[in-house]
Amino acid sequence: MFSRKKRELMKTPSISKKNRAGSPSPQPSGPHFISGETEAVSRPENPFNELPSDLPKELPRKDGADAVFPGTSLELPAGSSGVKATGTLKRPTSLSRHASAAGFPLSGAASWTLGRSHRSPLTAASPGELPTEGTGPDVVEDISHLLADVARFAEGLEKLKECVLRDDLLEARRPLAHECLGEALRVMRQIISKYPLLNTVETLTAAGTLIAKVKAFHYESNNDLEKQEFEKALETIAVAFSSAVSEFLMGEVDSSTLLAVPPGDSSQSMESLYGSGSEGTPPSLDDCDAGCLPAEEVDVLLQRCEGGVDAALLYAKNMAKYMKDLISYLEKRTTLEMEFAKGLQKMAHNCRQSVTQEPHMPLLSIYSLALEQDLEFGHGMVQAVGTLQTQTFMQPLTLRRLEHEKRRKEIKEAWHRAQRKLQEAESNLRKAKQGYTQRCEDHDKARFLVAKAEEEQAGTAPGAGSTATKTLDKRRRLEEEAKNKAEEAMATYRTCVADAKTQKQELEDTKVTALRQIQEVIRQSDQTIKSATISYYQMMHMQTAPLPVHFQMLCESSKLYDPGQQYASHVRQLQRDQEPDVHYDFEPHVSANAWSPVMRARKSSFNVSDVAGPEAAGSPPEEGGCIEGTPVKGHRAGRGHQVHKSWPLSISDSASGLDPGPGAGDFKKFERTSSSGTMSSTEELVDPEGGAGASAFEQADLNGMTPELPVAVPSGPFRHEGLSKAARTHRLRKLRTPAKCRECNSYVYFQGAECEECCLACHKKCLETLAIQCGHKKLQGRLQLFGQDFSHAARSAPDGVPFIVKKCVCEIERRALRTKGIYRVNGVKTRVEKLCQAFENGKELVELSQASPHDISNVLKLYLRQLPEPLISFRLYHELVGLAKDSLKAEAEAKAASRGRQDSSESEAVAVAMAGRLRELLRDLPPENRASLQYLLRHLRRIVEVEQDNKMTPGNLGIVFGPTLLRPRPTEATVSLSSLVDYPHQARVIETLIVHYGLVFEEEPEEIPGGQDESSNQRAEVVVQVPYLEAGEGVVYPLQEAAEDGCRESRVVSNDSDSDLEEASELLSSSEASALCRLSFLEQQQSEASLEEASGSHSGSEEQLETTAREDGDGDEDSPAQRLSGFNTNQSNNVLQTPLPPMRLRGGRITLGSCRERQPEFV
């Protein structure tokens, strides 16, 4: 195609120009040609210069109207009709089929589509400065250069066609095709920049269509329809460009589409429309890529269009209606959202009361958390809807609509005013023209009459000359008057013409101004709609994004529940009396005055004198029955000393399952005191199920200890209230002055209580849940604990580990190591918040024995998560994550090398290498961070060692603690994509630290109790004392093999724990109950050698007492038992003299040994 066009052009002997009107016209000279070409080249650069390196998006395509707009031609003076006007050259008919492709301009070079006969303007100069005829090259060298460039462009299109339509390299064809298209467009841009007159609408439109077809082409499928469309687009751009080159060489350039710029308005020149850039570059194709024309081109197009202002005003009016419809839609939708959120809140409130009414229900914590999340979602949605209505959408859009309507009406009024002025001027012009015509006719008639009178006077006789003279004079006066009137009418007519021209020009000025103002108003409204829409959908995303995470969390937590777990817990917590044994024996009839031997035997089956009180010291031992009547020999009377118990003395007929004997009324029920010296409400020695596991007989004399001092019963104004264990440690009195409650953090005015020693204030109703113990000194103010810098919290601890970490870890290790899902299952939010508040109010004095293990673990995770900088500093994050990535990559490579089979030795080598590298990196941590991290990981290692029970593997703990202990430096985004991607790597680091704890911190982790046992079930070893049983070494009593999980969960069995006593009693079968009814559980030893030394465990409060005793001691060298008994003045001492051999629970059997030389032992 291009070669044929080239041959035709080379055969052209000269360059001629056809005149559309058919009349001959002078040909332009050579210098004129050159100057015209120079002017054309000096115009702004083609927008293809702005094409990005990658391909632009599909250009929009619209069909332009083939209409000639009014007001575009220049008004010529009446006397200049002989001058040839600006040429309006007609497009060759052979190219008329491509006119529809020029729908609208794609460049900023003012190439507007105004019909088939319109072309882009030559320059940006005013119409008076334009040449009257088109320009073209005059030198053969220019033609040869142009044809060479055209040949390069044709070669680029051929390469593009081959690349797109080839059948091989399916995957590599797309980038190769884009590269070929970019090369062809680059050549085309160079040609247009060199010859600006080739920048036609048809060429740019065809280029946009070709770009769209190439980008939308499916290279992986053989679609004939797409290939046909691509070939058609390729042919279209070739034909359009070759036609432009032909017209350029023939000189057929149309300049009739120039903008009619109002005189005197320099701001509307083409230079100012394109901007004051250094090179005058017009708007780039980026604007076209975005789907809209540059603002200046839109105004110019409407200026040339008939009724352009009315069309713009109509669009502005429709836009105001559109904004109103948007506001209506969002109002209705937000109303529905508000109703749903309020209904959800109301439903959650009502259901929460009914759902949480009964404890120990299946998945109760899951649904409690779900209800809390529903409440939070409803509250957040209500706030979001309120924000939408008042700040981000409704109000701004409503104000913008009102302003939009106001400005539209003002612009419309100004436009109509200008139109009315022009109409008045045109009406005056028509009237003046009519008057002028009438006066001229009257003047002509008067002149005719004067001429006729003169002829009559010349033909009359000399005697009648006076009458003719008078008639002539009269007609001359009339002719003079008619002439004057005609001149006045002509002057009026000229004035009206000038006024009409002025009003017409003013109308054009008003049109330009109105279009600019309308577009400004529309753009402002567009921006407001855009901002409001972004704010709306962003807010909706923020409200709905957490929902999938919450549902996934609830799903994972629900998977950890075992069916029947809550029912078992409910049965274990039942405080019911034992069902009495009913015997159906034959009883022969006896007389009314005689008793049956069977009845006498039943009445004498229990002798209460076996239960020796303080006054029974020195009395001979008596034989009595135990739980099932098995005889047990007692030795307490022969000991000659009294010791104190750390639990209450309680006897009950129903609880013991025995009939009361004589003297049973001498026993009183005492309540146990806590180790801090005051009463405890929940430590009464009563089995939760009301069973015989801790009978009254055992309670009265367990471990051979009898009360030495009376235990104080709670007194004062709150003695009849239900007090928590921590509340019973305070000396309470009525509140005297208003204060803030340390439990619920609200003010107390009436019905309040305060401690006489620590001045703690609390509501009366809050005493049931109070978790802060009495410190026997004034309680300090509230501490900002959560969210505080870690160095401040660790500064107060001697070893660098904050007290909250120690407190939570110790409590979990004491009674929740074997709890299933520990750290994985979330606690109840309200209880967790109360515990956090208690830690900030009471610090180390918080009582955790009544808290749920999951709540305690949640508090610990929350504290670590809210640290401004995690335990593992930000500066180590990227190195640790990179190390985890390398480790995972190495494992994957090793697995691939072994053909998919996991080699444990290679994986272990990779993990050990990673652990060594972790050890080197963690040495850079601050001392307090490293100490706390080591303390926490030692605890997690202990949890992993019993993973068969708690189901918490190192991987699970890594998933939980990875984002908590190791997280990147925070950014502006709520959740960055990189942090989500790094979750597996964070978990990998923590998992390696747990598994290789000893290698990382260069010490061996402590083994849990039972770890030294040869049996594989890892049962806890229980050391018990049998004060009333004399047996030699090697006496063995079998135990039940099936013990409840509750007994195995406790790592250290304390003498102060009721649950430990209850669990130990459940370990014994009914056949050995008589022999083991007075067992005392001691702490398990760390090794086989230390088992014989019977070193007991200490609770947190006992350690506090020992520390105080050492500080207040007088330096004597008394035994620890003497110092402790001297310190405990109002509570039972924990001194236990155990001269008899200890009993050990090993492998489901109890082994007794003899050890006569025993020292007092701390329990």
From Swiss-Prot:
Pfam families, sorted: GMIP-like_FCH (PF22699), RHG29_45_N (PF24235), RhoGAP (PF00620)
Annotated InterPro entries: AH/BAR_dom_sf (IPR027267), C1-like_sf (IPR046349), F_BAR (IPR031160), FCH_dom (IPR001060), GMIP/FCHO2-like_FCH (IPR054713), PE/DAG-bd (IPR002219), RHG29_45_N (IPR057028), Rho_GTPase_activation_prot (IPR008936)
Location (main, coarse): cytoplasm
Keyword tags: Cell membrane, Cell projection, Coiled coil, Cytoplasm, GTPase activation, Membrane, Metal-binding, Phosphoprotein, Zinc, Zinc-finger
Residue ranges, compositional bias (Polar residues): 1125-1137
Parts forming coiled coils: 403-526
GO molecular function: GTPase activator activity; zinc ion binding
Listed Basic and acidic residues bias regions: 55-65
Secreted found in the keyword field: no
Residue ranges annotated for the Rho-GAP domain, each copy included: 788-1001
Subcellular location per the Swiss-Prot or TrEMBL entry: Cytoplasm; Cell projection, Ruffle membrane
GO terms under cellular component: cytoplasm; ruffle membrane
Domain F-BAR: start-end pairs: 296-566
GO biological process: regulation of small GTPase mediated signal transduction; signal transduction
Biased composition (Basic residues): 633-644
Biased composition (Low complexity): 458-470, 673-682, 1087-1099
Chain positions of site Arginine finger: R824
Modified residues (Phosphoserine): S23, S25, S100, S120, S126, S596, S605, S619, S646, S976, S1054, S1057, S1059
Zn-finger (Phorbol-ester/DAG-type) residues: 729-774
Spans annotated as Disordered: 1-99, 118-137, 262-282, 454-475, 610-695, 1042-1067, 1087-1163
Top-level taxon of the source organism: Eukaryota
Functional summary from the UniProt entry: Contains a GTPase activator for the Rho-type GTPases (RhoGAP) domain that would be able to negatively regulate the actin cytoskeleton as well as cell spreading. However, also contains N-terminally a BAR-domin which is able to play an autoinhibitory effect on this RhoGAP activity.
Record comment regarding domains: Rho-GAP domain is able to regulate RhoGTPase activity, actin cytoskeleton and cell spreading. However N-terminally BAR domain plays an autoinhibitory role.
Name of the protein in its database record: Rho GTPase-activating protein 45
Species of the source: Pongo abelii (Sumatran orangutan)
This protein's encoding gene: ARHGAP45
